[in-house]
Amino acid sequence: MSFFNFRKIFKLGSEKKKKQYEHVKRDLNPEEFWETIGELGDGAFGKVYKAQNKETNVLAAAKVIDTKSEEELEDYMVEIDILASCDHPNIVKLLDAFYYENNLWILIEFCAGGAVDAVMLELERPLTESQIQVVCKQTLEALNYLHDNKIIHRDLKAGNILFTLDGDIKLADFGVSAKNTRTIQRRDSFIGTPYWMAPEVVMCETSKDRPYDYKADVWSLGITLIEMAEIEPPHHELNPMRVLLKIAKSEPPTLAQPSRWSSNFKDFLKKCLEKNVDARWTTSQLLQHPFVTIDSNKPIRELIAEAKAEVTEEVEDGKEEDDDEEIENSLPIPTNKRASSDLSIASSEEDKLSQNACILESVSEKTEHNASGDKFSTKVLNEKPCPGEPENAVELVGGAVAVLPDRATELPESGREEKRPKLDRLPDTEDQEMADINSVSEGEEDHAVTSETNIEHNLKPEKERDQEKQPVLENKLVKSEDTTIQTVDLVSQETGEKEVDIHILDSEVVHAVEDTHEKLRKDDTTQKDVISDTSSVGERDEEIGAVPKTAESSAEGAQGDGGKETDEGAQILISKATEGPKASGTEEAPPVTEITETNDTDQKLVENTHEKQLPISSETTLDTSEGLGASEGREVTESGSTEEVEVEGAVSETDEEDVQSETRGAPMAVTQMDTEKNETPHEAPAQVEVQVPVPPQPSEPPPAPIPSININSEAAENKGEMGASLNTETILLPESESQKENDTDSGTGSTADNSSIDLNLSISSFLSKTKDNGSISLQETRRQKKTLKKTRKFIVDGVEVSVTTSKIVTDSDSKTEELRFLRRQELRELRFLQKEEQRAQQQLNGKLQQQREQIFRRFEQEMMSKKRQYDQEIENLEKQQKQTIERLEQEHTNRLRDEAKRIKGEQEKELSKFQNILKNRKKEVLNEVEKAPKDLRKELMKRRKEELAQSQHVQEQDFVQKQQQELDGSLKKIIQQQKAELANIERECLNNKQQLMRAREAAIWELEERHLQEKHQLLKQQLKDQYFMQRHQLLKRHEKETEQMQRYNQRLIEELKNRQTQERARLPKIQRSEAKTRMAMFKKSLRINSTATPDQDRDKIKQFSAQEEKRQKNERMAQHQKHENQMRDLQLQCEANVRELHQLQNEKCHLLVEHETQKLKELDEEHSQELKEWREKLRPRKKTLEEEFARKLQEQEVFFKMTGESECLNPSTQSRISKFYPIPSLHSTGS
């Protein structure tokens, strides 16, 4: 076995080397350096702990993330790199990072103030505008720094903005942030939290054509500002996935009540929430906006001090009452007259419910309450109850008769809208005043304070609100420089009663009212309401002085003490309308908060455990402008908590009994109303005074009369409807004669004037409409009610402040927490999904990039290989040609040498023969000379020798020259032959070389075309892969969305089942109590009108009992039918929701397929265009190549021609060959 196989078996050296990161310490135990001292929370990807450095004692927030692999570890490197690279006072700093035992520890700067959303939840109210300004400016500076460093945060929200104890903010959570490499780089990832996503980010879910840049953070900033102003972001009532469609298609969100906020704030939001990205301002531009010119962070320091204050909690149980206490003696109440146009019109279902309920003959009185909380009024019938009137539960509270509306049989929203009185829309400048008495909007947490002798808070059951599916509405707090307006407007949807608590105060004008929880248990009902305006100090004083004449004397007691305290600067009572966080369909009970600011010399705390209530008796009608309550959708009165701030100086605490004695029987102070002059006349009087005495009961001490309610209509100007505009100095209070009522339960609209009614018939009406087949009774509510009292003590700028918050604790609180937890779970699931999608997208992008690199590398290799192949062939051809030429030249040289030798040999022989002939001739001359005489012989010999020598020399030269010419001719002929042969070979070689070059170019062109095709196919396949992943991710999101929808629907069904079970269980008890009460009252009426004999009375009683049994049976059947209808409607609604969801999902899938088809088509068109352009460029390339070949061929021909001619110009010139083989001349020959 080889060593390499051995290594494979034991995996020696095969382990992948761990990647080292710059800011992450590996294989070091973080617990050796940091001590965990507590848990801060549970994030989407792991727990967050509070840690302390063992050496420096520096605190840190340690995020511990379980990472299974190196690939998962890389997902968090972007966050760590961004944190490490950022150095800004408003961005959290990275203190340390460890990777130990598959856990990634990220230790960041600890911010003790907590997140903005957590502070709002803790204090149960949104931020004020000054606080928002501070947060906004510092957040803008942080964003501007990030954007300058090419970083997009992509998850900006209140939960990611942290407070420090110094009153500054730190931007955190860069888990989904993007770090670009270029300034103008854009992104196309669908990532972030839906509620805060910019429209261009939302569009990336189905289309990557329009990527986004840094301005996506600016949109998120605008949404975050709305979140801080209203506790929840816009569209928070929607599912996290479904809100995306809302963002993409609807107009940019705005503040729910713009009039409560400054114009700078609204303009700033407008600049942030601009759907057109090009028109949206950048962070640097926004920093120049006047909204963020604030320099001090004092508002945040006060906020943090309050949020981090010491909290003392106290739970008070509500008193229990027996069922028998419901039965009250008749009250001497004057009868009311009813207008002929106010006849009740009941729905068909209510006809069936109450057809047997009209037993007693006379006028009945009914206080109805709008189901949406927008209006309520008192209705009086001058005939016996019609069969169509709803059967509503009635409680006798403090002598007043209240009728419980039928919550289960509400009309649909459109029906409510049609029945409401059409009220004039108030201008924005008067929204503050109108908001003070605006009704609680739909789905809001309504409260009533009611009992036998006092008024207590009564909460509507959470389940009924869920059933109604009313939108969750938010509260807004308005704060100007020197005036704070806070309002509490409470409606009990159980009793139809509405209590209005209005406190408008500034630093100079104060009206204090006390109503402690103990007073609610006193014999007399004491109620006060303080009303002031939002104008300047002088205007307020004038307005407060404008109390109706009939109420002045009794109002003095209520206002006198408050005025005294104001003059002395001792006590300030501020009622702040705040709101607890609300999940979809749920709200929290608004607690009453009291802030007591005491100086060092006097540390007295005045408790105010309940809101001041405006009693709504049977003669009063309260209505409000629908334009504010319904259309605006959010009211100050929808708060989850109400704070009353009381600052005490050296004034002693007012005794509760004194306050009671002063306020007992005193009317409520009411400001005058300025109404429009063109209102229609009404038959009701201009001023109405109502007194409802309460007779003593056997089980209780004799109660005092209910305080009179004086309403001045200001010379009967308010004669028509109530929706007239108000000026900025007034606060509208209800006038019973001008109100119209919309009863959503029975479809009945009626008005009542302020005449007296007959109690017997009122009770009869009450009994005929009682409890609406199982609605929660007041006694049940009182038994379930607990009051949670929180007291916060903290110091702001050396002044100790105490805040007391009283909140009624019901099941709705836990339900709210549960729904908020479920919503967080949904967001967490979405975050996980996004993280998985991002990882999968990164993996796919890496894979596709690798594929592109591989194919381009292959293209290059193929091209180089093809070129190398043809270059090699051309080189071989040239080498072969060279060798051939060299061989031929060698052959030609050898042949020429041989031929020259041969000719030379022949010429030498001929020359030798010629020389022999010359010798013979010389001999002959010698012989001839010898024959001459001797004396002449010597001279003749000499002369004849000279002649012979000359002639022979000339002959020999001629002979040699002739031989040379013959030799040159022969060699020339041979050379020409060789030249022709070489030219042919060169031409053939050039042709072969050009053919190879043509083949090379053709192969290159073919390769280029094939590469274009392959590149197109690859890009097409990659595009399909990308869209396949998008479809897969979209389907996963749809599955998650469907799963969440099914869970939501299942919760609704379960809640409805539980509520129906409770109603079925309550109905027999209610019926028994009713039967007992009705029988007692029937017998009492028989005793009063005792004209018949005892037998006749017994028969009437039997008949009444039979009718009661029949009525109860009908009630049970009606309840059963109602429950079936409710379940059927709910199931239909759930099915409709699922269908709508599937339709939206199909639209998204269809849109994605359309985008894919469009992109594929564009890709094909691009390929066709590219191919066309390539082919167009190919023709000139071919032409250029052929021209080059022709030029080279011509050059070769000219070369060979010129060479041949140059050598033939001088025939006597020796050739290159003959030069080396000279013919011997006469000088070289022997003689």
Curated annotation (Swiss-Prot):
This is STE20-like serine/threonine-protein kinase. The modification Phosphoserine is found at residues 14, 189, 330, 340-341, 344, 347-348, 354, 372, 507, 536, 554, 641, 661, 775, 814. The active site is at residue 155. The lineage of its organism: Eukaryota, Metazoa, Chordata, Craniata, Vertebrata. Residues 407-428, 446-478, 516-531, 601-613 have a biased composition (Basic and acidic residues). Its EC number is 2.7.11.1. Keywords: Apoptosis, ATP-binding, Coiled coil, Cytoplasm, Kinase, Nucleotide-binding, Phosphoprotein, Serine/threonine-protein kinase, Transferase. GO terms for molecular function: ATP binding; protein homodimerization activity; protein serine kinase activity; protein serine/threonine kinase activity. It comes from Cavia porcellus. InterPro entries: Kinase-like_dom_sf, PKK, Prot_kinase_dom, Protein_kinase_ATP_BS, Ser/Thr_kinase_AS, STE20_Ser/Thr_Kinases, UVR_dom.
